[in-house]
Structures are given as C-alpha cells and as structure tokens.
Regions:
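Positively charged, low-complexity terminal tracts
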Residues: 1-76
Length: 76
C-alpha cells in the first residue's frame, strides 16, 4: 500500500495530510500533518496511534472555534 496525501489551501495557509501504510502486519498506519503559512514557520505533527488522532481533532475544533470570532471581527 502506498502513502496518500490530501492538500487543503486557503489564502496563504496550506495543510497537507499524508497517511502512510503500516510498516508491518498488525501495526497501525501513521499520519503526518504538515502546515505552511507565510506568517508561521513550517510545522509537522506525526501520529501513529488512533487516540492521538482523536486528541488532534478535538484540538483543531477548539482552535477553529477560538479564531473564527476574531476573523469575523477583522472583516468588519
């Protein structure tokens, strides 16, 4: 099985999510998330267990809810 990458782009923010196959039978696949933006240094997050993905999802939802009101205020 090959790796699979999905890329999302909005304004100057680029997010790439790459899923890598399990290296050995019985092992879980892993996920790498790469974020690029002109205002931030390039960063990577690597997950190799399902609970880590759930924690990241919760963190991402909280981030979106925190910054959505700020974006709406700057659009005025």
């Amino acid at each position: 099985m090959k790796s699979h990458t999905i890329e999302f782009t909005r304004d100057d923010l680029v997010v790439r999510i790459t899923r890598y196959p399990a290296g050995e039978p019985g092992k879980s696949p892993s996920v790498e998330i790469e974020v690029e933006s002109s205002g931030l240094p390039r960063s990577f997050v690597w997950f190799d267990r399902e609970p880590q993905l759930f924690a990241f999802k919760e963190m991402l939802e909280e981030y979106i809810e925190t910054f959505r009101p700020m974006k709406d205020e700057t659009a005025l």
